[in-house]
Amino acid sequence: MGKIVKAVKKIINLTPGIKEASVSVYHKYSQLRYRKYVKKYPIDAHTVVFESYMGRKYSCSPRAMFEAMCEDSRYRDYKKVWAFTDPEKHRYLEKYPNTILVKYRSEDYYRYYARAGMWITNYLLDYGIEKRPGQIYVQTWHGTPLKKIGCDVPRLELSKKERERTCREYQREGQMIDFMPSPSPFYTEKVKSAFCLGPQARILEFGYPRNDDLFRYTEEKCENIKKELGIPADKKVILYAPTWRQSQHTAGEGFTYSLGIDFDKMKTRLGDKAVILFRTHYFISNSFDFSKYGGFIKDVSSYDEINDLYLISDLLITDYSSVFFDYANLERPILFYMYDYEAYREEMKDFYFGIELLPGPVIKEERDISEDVERLLEGFAVDDTYRRFNEIFNPHREVCGDRMVREIIREYR
């Protein structure tokens, strides 16, 4: 059955006009599923729906705010509903009182969205869902952007039809959002324009709940994470987290990723002293076989909470992913391996700022980087560029999820 569904999706994506028509039909179908529950149920102010990365993970700011609510007596009697593509994987969350798990885009999913007094998500809502008067929408997004997003994307990057669709999706979102957390004035400015935020939206600019774990971890927690992942205590940990490429897309399958890093050379130089954690973007559909490297490379792409990976890593290697904004809170070394920089700039057209602001060395050609990695592991110090970066992008470096939920109560309850 899975192969048949995959084949049908591929045909749809490869046939001009059919993809757009199928998306339109799906949107209408989703709206019908949602609206029947709107007609049937009143809003329950004491129900909150949480969703992270379209149901893929228990992570990011929705997780931080959920855990803050669980610790806040004012939310004790609230029903807390999590939407997951695989609810069985997350049954452990039912240990929290009044916590319910539903399958992403199931009937229960639309029913709880229609009834809930509050939604907390980090991605665009399912197109069938429309906010009712009296509901509260907290859109946390999923990181500070380097690449332009939403209505800020340059006209040259997308076709007219694609740009209109993108702007429509973000504008629709922006007219429903009531609250957005913000880690910086830079972030506030960009989400206002990218989402064309309406007058009802309030930006809470005192930190990013998704980073809470980075300010309250213990050595014991780090040791436990390493044990869980099978990482020897005496090895340095390198987190490699590249982003997706628009040009690496297979119709009917999704985005793929072609490795631009020479792991063979890295193992030769670093194999006896380090472990690499490989983390792809959640858009990436292809898998990787690192078995020939033994325990030197561990694929942690399916690991829910990236903060755990930040905490145990001695160095981050990335490219254009927003992970470096979060990781910089730890003031640890970052290497920007932008081996396809010129092609990527041509493809994406524009970033929100120049690479001269980045808090680490930038490599703009494909080559062996093991020596650069070794140098950073052995002799790193926070410099003026790194400090300036955090002043601009991470001025509020403290736990804020609990304050966020208090502000929402104060404003609306």
Locations of regions flagged by a protein language model:
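A donor-sugar binding/catalytic signature common to diverse glycosyltransferases
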Residues: 118-148, 303-348
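Extended catalytic core of nucleotide-activated donor transferases of GT-like folds
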Residues: 63-67, 98-162, 168
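N-terminal pre-catalytic "stem/leader" segment of glycosyltransferase-like enzymes
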Residues: 2-107
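A nucleotide-sugar donor-handling region in carbohydrate enzymes
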Residues: 16-31, 150-250, 382-386
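Conserved catalytic-core segment of nucleotide-activated headgroup transferases in glycan assembly
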Residues: 59-67, 209-291, 363-365, 400
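A short beta-strand/loop micro-motif in the catalytic core of glycosyltransferases
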Residues: 119-120, 178-184, 276-277, 316-317
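Catalytic binding pocket for nucleotide-activated donors in carbohydrate/polymer assembly enzymes
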Residues: 291-295, 322-393
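Donor nucleotide-activated moiety binding/catalytic core segment of transferases
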Residues: 101-117, 277, 282-325
